[in-house]
Amino acid sequence: MPGYYALKPSGSQFMFNLKADNHQTILTSERYESKQNAQRGIESVRENCRDDARYTRKSSKASEPYFTLTSTNGQTIGLSEMYSSTAAMENGIESCKRNGPSLDEREPA
């Protein structure tokens, strides 16, 4: 079963999380001024998630690995959680590649 996008309001703005089928968050977006812009961000994830060159592997100040997904214009689309190891981060990237193409968008009731 593929993952899904959880689209939700954040104050007066909107954001989304890409979630795996077990409901674990894989990628968190920035905040967008409108729901329509957040939906464009979701479309950008779909378009870019399978291209390994779109992922930037990073390390936090506490040496925790994480990744960002960027669009072809270099803008960050989303940010992962902090992982306990590089291998766990690579698994997160693979999960993003598998679940990112999902057409399933969900909003809170």
Where are these regions (language model features)?
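Intrinsic N-terminal pre-sequences and regulatory tails
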Residues: 1-4, 109
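A structural feature that tracks compact, well-ordered secondary-structure segments
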Residues: 6-8, 15-20, 26-32, 41-44, ...
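Intrinsically disordered, low-complexity regulatory segments
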Residues: 10, 20, 102-109
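Alpha-helical recognition helix of canonical C2H2 zinc-finger domains
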Residues: 38, 89
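Short arginine-rich
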Residues: 46-54, 97-106
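Cysteine/selenocysteine-centered motifs that mediate thiol-based redox chemistry or coordinate metal-sulfur cofactors
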Residues: 57-62, 107-109
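Short, mixed-charge low-complexity intrinsically disordered segments
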Residues: 62, 70, 102-105
